[in-house]
A protein has these predicted regions:
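Domain-terminus/edge residues, biased toward the C-terminal soluble/receptor-binding domains
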Residues: 1-185
Length: 185
């Protein structure tokens, strides 16, 4: 989805009529497309060995974050309806049991350390995209962040250059380590 965003819309097509054929439509086998407006794909499958399978993806509004995408994967279901029902349960659980927390906006300085031998005396470090983490619902207040970076910072530094990292923890357990990039020079 990130590598080929131009194709994402194809997975949400509910019905398709092959050009040059009679007026019969081919329905998408992902039943969630017909049940939940937040679902926009992705892949169904069935074999005797694997049963009915579905990778479903949905986008819903997340307070303070914007659109939040989740994926569910169901393997070995007994029917098309069962795979859709179980996928819907997983998506609903994911959206209610976990909060998306935006720690920093795109291009927001996480830290502004001093820099030696540069045009300016300081440089902003952050990310070009927002820094967002998922945590159990209600746990956002227990997130901690720590910046690790080399000392001292010496020019030249280039925009987009990785200079250190932001370590994010929840209850002293690591969640993610995000490389910090030079936002300006």
């Amino acid at each position: 989805m990130q590598d080929f965003p131009d194709y994402v819309g194809y997975y949400a097509i509910k019905k398709y009529r092959y050009p040059g054929t009679p007026a019969a439509n081919e329905n998408n086998r992902n039943l969630l497309l017909f049940r939940d407006p937040s679902v926009d794909g992705l892949k169904t499958g069935h074999t005797d060995a694997a049963g009915f399978c579905l990778i479903a993806t949905a986008k819903r509004e997340a307070p303070g974050v914007g659109q939040r995408r989740l994926l569910s994967i169901v393997l070995g279901a007994s029917s098309e309806n069962a795979r859709a029902t179980e996928s819907q349960k997983l998506l609903n659980w994911g959206y209610t049991a976990f909060d998306a927390i935006k720690l920093f906006d795109a291009n927001q300085a996480v830290v502004t350390p001093n820099v030696w031998k540069g045009r300016g005396s300081q440089v902003k470090l952050g990310r070009m995209a927002p820094i967002v983490v998922a945590v159990p619902a209600g746990a956002g207040g227990r997130i901690q962040t720590q910046v690790a970076r080399p000392e001292p910072l010496v020019a030249p530094l280039n925009r987009g250059q990785a200079v250190g990292a932001l370590k994010v923890t929840l209850d002293q357990k690591p969640l993610v380590v995000v490389p910090l990039l030079v936002l300006d020079t």
